[in-house]
A protein has these predicted regions:
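Positively charged n-region of N-terminal signal peptides that target proteins for export
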Residues: 1-5
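Glycoside hydrolase catalytic-domain context in secreted enzymes
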Residues: 22-650, 656-658, 663-673
Length: 683
């Protein structure tokens, strides 16, 4: 009892001191607006203090770190890698986090609610591990499927990427963590990534490579944007006023801060004038060189203030001054369950002849084979790598699901030995994949090593072969027609073994769709010349224009291995009754989806719009999707709304979106190549 009054006095002393501090430092008064607080803070800073806040300054524990200013009550500012969990590779000591499935798996869900939950987990763990910013999501369009960072993105379609990216951002930021959407813009290859000059025409840039960034700002309300490595039409993105000022701030209303990618800044004056707010990783351009530029009158101190205000305003708006993030234990059991759920939802059933899947729980023997069957595939390589809190490898995952079955593991290094094992098993499950990584592109979409030979040998030995593909993007499958079932699992994350088992045995009915086209051959890609990719003499020509992904396949009349939007279920669905009508400057399409099978399941209804031929657009473009969950025999009317922007193209004469007049075609179905419903629409 004796200590009680003393504790009370101490607490009262702290609470009474707070207004005094706020009076001397009004920016610490949470009753004021973020804009006012930021302005008051910057006005109180010395020039040296201002410059110290323009760039990262690694310390003994953190690489991506802006140090505090105790005199002014400015907290330290820590930045974490994303986008599939808190990637702490730069921290010392490194901190484990939940390794979620790759965002390519997230994109496969075609589900904005799932994307928001995914982001919410990333944001919560980023804050719990005492960081202010999550560098993600990565929403660059998959122009080149061989890109080493395909796994970090969300596919090839700007409409899909924009919808899911905005939802992911909203989820990240629910926890007071700032989402830093990246890489702005057209960061589409790793080869020569820090110097490549991408020649992109104005229409293509605005129709394919910018709309999803616009959504990240206008719908996701991203607090930060990372400017990318490449040049676009001769100008590095981090010193490109057309991108950082004209588009981002003036046209889209962005109020947050722009941070450079690691070493992506190339100037002091140019970057400052363009609107790059924060240099990563050190002060090469925004340190002493910035101070000298100010003293020489090349950059005004007012401009320095203007560069600082957006980050401080964002920190105030996110409560990071009033409640800085502190280390907090992670709810690992709950987040493990979420990681498993995300992985299951993102797996795409590519092929399932004779309804081989789901497997029966009564199976007696399973041959588990392949280089990706030995341990969990938690993610790709590079800055996005997450140190998992735990892992479920494929073997224990299968054994836990079917404890009565004999499951035997073979790493697949000897196809003949693996085939012999498969021949003696009731079912063979072959796990193959790739190892995409930041910093280099894949030389081919073919599986490395002997994996193709392995699948062929096992399939020949056992007619009940299931192939599970763990890849970051498309891979070639010369054996596809010889195996009855193919499950695209992407990089499933730390719950790999449990999630794959859940889908194989029907605990989950797959409903995911491909967010990227799987070609049949390396040459079957839009950027298929050296001039287009990786470029010649440091220049990559985007001469394919608008024909990227499924748009190119449609325009060329070429059949892919598996089309964009494709994905099977353990049940079947039918579409009927399409009705399209104009509503103001937009339109609505209404149709019926019916579950014609014997299991409950979900279908993703996709709407594609074909423009009048004179518009010069690809044959069809995704403009809407809707996920529908149905019991056997159940049907539901679905409505998808189209906005005026959906009927517009970028006019290079007016430098603006312009509505197209004429006859449009609305198509509805379950993939870009399976569209049973069609209706004309005159505008």
């Amino acid at each position: 009892m004796r200590n009680g009054p003393l504790v009370l006095v101490a607490v009262l002393g702290l609470s009474l001191a707070a207004p005094a501090v706020a009076g001397a430092a009004p920016w610490l008064d949470a009753r004021q607006s973020p804009d006012r607080r930021a302005a008051e803070l910057v006005a109180a800073m010395t020039l040296d203090e201002k410059i110290s806040q323009l760039h990262l300054q690694p310390d003994a524990e953190h690489q991506r770190f802006v140090p505090p200013i105790p005199r002014l009550g400015v907290p330290g500012f820590r930045i974490a890698n994303g986008p599939a969990g808190m990637g702490p590779a730069d921290d010392k000591p490194q901190k484990p986090a939940t390794a979620l499935p790759a965002t390519m798996a997230l994109a496969s869900t075609f589900d904005t609610d799932v994307a928001r939950k995914y982001g919410r987990l990333v944001g919560a763990e980023t804050r719990a591990l005492a960081h202010n910013v999550s560098e993600g999501p990565d929403i660059n369009i998959a122009r080149v499927p061989r890109n080493g960072r395909t796994f970090e993105g969300m596919g090839e379609d700007p409409f899909l990427v924009g919808a899911l990216g905005a939802a992911d951002i909203r989820g990240i930021q629910e926890n007071g963590t700032i989402a830093e959407v990246k890489h702005y813009a057209a960061n589409n290859q790793e080869t020569q990534r820090q110097s490549i000059d991408e020649h992109i025409d104005e229409r293509t840039l605005n129709e394919l490579y910018l709309p999803h960034f616009e959504q990240a700002v206008t719908e996701g309300h991203a607090g930060s944007v990372m400017c990318a490595y490449p040049k676009i039409n001769g100008v590095f993105t981090c010193e490109n006023p057309a991108l950082l000022q004209d588009k981002l701030r003036d046209d889209w209303g962005f109020e947050g801060f722009v941070q450079s990618d690691w070493g992506a800044a190339h100037s002091t004056v140019g970057s400052a004038n363009a609107g790059m707010n924060l240099e990563m990783i050190d002060g090469t351009w925004y340190g002493e060189k910035m101070k000298q530029a100010v003293l020489a009158g090349q950059v005004s101190e007012q401009r320095v203030d203007e560069l600082l205000l957006p980050r401080f305003r964002t920190m105030f708006a996110f409560g990071q001054f009033d409640h800085p993030p502190v280390l907090t234990p992670l709810p690992t059991a709950r987040h493990d369950a979420a990681a498993k759920d995300f992985a299951e939802r993102g797996m795409v059933l590519l092929r399932n002849e004779h309804a081989q899947l789901p497997l029966s729980s009564a199976v007696r023997s399973i041959a588990l084979i392949g280089p990706f069957a030995t341990k969990a595939k938690t993610g790709g390589g590079g800055s996005s790598a997450v140190i998992p809190t735990s892992t479920v490898d494929p073997l224990p995952g299968l054994r836990a699901r079917v404890p009565g079955a004999a499951v035997t593991l073979d790493d697949g290094s000897d196809p003949a030995r693996a085939a012999a094992l498969a021949a003696g098993a009731e079912v063979a499950v072959v796990m193959v994949g790739d190892n995409e990584t930041e910093g280099k592109d894949r030389p081919s979409l073919a599986l490395e090593g002997n994996q193709d030979a392995l699948v062929a040998a096992v399939a020949a030995a056992n007619p009940h072969t299931v192939v599970v593909v763990k890849s970051g993007g498309p891979v070639l499958m010369p054996w596809a027609a010889s195996v009855p079932s193919i499950l695209q699992a992407w990089y499933p994350g730390q719950q790999d073994g449990a999630a794959v088992a859940g889908v194989l045995f029907g605990d989950v009915n797959p409903s995911a769709k491909l967010p990227i086209t799987f070609p049949a051959a390396d040459a079957d890609t839009p950027a298929n010349t050296a001039a287009q990719f990786p470029g010649v003499n440091g220049v990559a020509e985007y001469s394919e224009g608008l024909q990227v992904g499924y748009r190119w396949f449609d325009a060329q009349g070429r059949a892919p291995l598996f089309p964009f939007g494709h994905g099977l279920s353990y049940t079947t669905f039918a579409f009927s009754g399409l009705s399209v009508r104009t509503t103001g400057d937009g339109a609505t399409a209404t149709f019926t989806v019916r579950n014609t099978g014997h299991r409950a399941g979900a279908e993703v209804a996709q709407l594609y719009l074909g423009f009048p031929s004179a518009a010069g657009e690809p044959p069809r473009q995704l403009k809407g999707f809707s996920r529908v969950s149905l019991a056997p025999g159940q049907s539901q009317r679905v409505t998808i709304r189209l906005a005026a922007r959906d009927f517009s193209v970028w006019d290079t004469g007016r430098h603006a979106w312009t509505p197209v007049k004429g006859g449009f075609t609305v198509q509805v179905g379950d993939s870009s190549r399976s569209l049973p419903l069609q209706a004309p629409l005159k505008r």
